[in-house]
């Protein structure tokens, strides 16, 4: 998965969610 841009939401990909969490860029509901 790729890092998400500021304000974007995760699509359910664990990689994207982890990146999202690590960078505190967006909310992620699915892990």
Curated annotation (Swiss-Prot):
Task: Describe the function of this protein.
Answer: Omega-agatoxins are antagonists of voltage-gated calcium channels (Cav).
Q: Which Pfam families match?
A: Toxin_34 (PF08396)
* Subcellular locations according to the entry: Secreted
Q: Which InterPro entries match?
A: Toxin_34
- Annotated keywords: Calcium channel impairing toxin, Disulfide bond, Ion channel impairing toxin, Neurotoxin, Secreted, Toxin, Voltage-gated calcium channel impairing toxin
Query: What is the predominant subcellular site recorded for this chain?
Result: secreted
GO molecular function per UniProt = calcium channel regulator activity; toxin activity
The record's tissue-specificity note reads:
Expressed by the venom gland.
Give the protein name, as stated in the record: U14-ctenitoxin-Co1a
Question: Could you say which protein family the record assigns here?
Answer: Belongs to the neurotoxin 04 (omega-agtx) family. 03 (type II/III omega-agtx) subfamily.
Q: GO cellular-component terms in the record?
A: extracellular region
Q: Which domain of life is it from?
A: Eukaryota
State whether keyword Kinase applies.
no
